[in-house]
Swiss-Prot record:
Keywords: Ribonucleoprotein, Ribosomal protein, RNA-binding, rRNA-binding. It comes from the Bacteria. Part of the 30S ribosomal subunit. Contacts proteins S5 and S12. One of the primary rRNA binding proteins, it binds directly to 16S rRNA central domain where it helps coordinate assembly of the platform of the 30S subunit. GO terms for biological process: translation. GO terms for cellular component: cytosolic small ribosomal subunit. This is Small ribosomal subunit protein uS8. GO terms for molecular function: rRNA binding; structural constituent of ribosome. The keyword Ribosomal protein applies. Belongs to the universal ribosomal protein uS8 family. Coiled coil: none annotated. The lineage of its organism: Bacteria, Fusobacteriati, Fusobacteriota, Fusobacteriia, Fusobacteriales. It holds the Pfam family Ribosomal_S8.
Length: 132
């Protein structure tokens, strides 16, 4: 299946699984999606993730979602920069999600990082998504 926007597909799968309180969700693998899952784990939005291979020898990322009792840890996921409308931000204009309570995932020349890391390293880039 061909996807126009694989990052939006990943975020939608996580959002939908989170909405119905699933324990885990499988996402087709790419290095960019793996790095986004890594950031979500580092920031405490998911409990874990691992790379699994299915019977067709295709790699998937299995994301284990995190809940605080019956409360969802991920309140929202939003795709910002889309294939039809790219959104770039300089270090000075880097957005703050919910006044710093959420994170922005940014693709920079130093890799895919959070908005806080991008500010610390003084680099701008493409704002991929907001998570809160």
């Amino acid at each position: 299946m061909y996807l126009t926007d694989p990052i939006a597909d990943m975020l939608t799968r996580v959002r939908n699984a989170n909405a119905v309180m699933h324990e885990k969700v499988d996402i087709p693998h790419s290095k960019m999606k793996e790095r986004i899952a890594e950031i979500l784990k580092e920031q405490g939005y998911i409990s874990n993730f691992k790379i699994v291979t299915d019977e067709g020898n295709k790699k998937n990322i299995r994301v284990y979602l995190k809940y605080a009792g019956k409360e969802r840890v991920i309140k929202g996921l939003k795709r910002i920069s889309k294939p039809g409308r790219r959104v770039y931000s300089s270090v000075d204009d880097m957005p703050r999600v919910l006044s710093g309570l959420g994170i922005a995932i940014v693709s920079t020349s130093k890799g895919i990082v959070t908005d806080k890391v991008a500010r610390a390293e003084k680099v701008g880039g493409e704002v991929l998504a907001f998570v809160w």
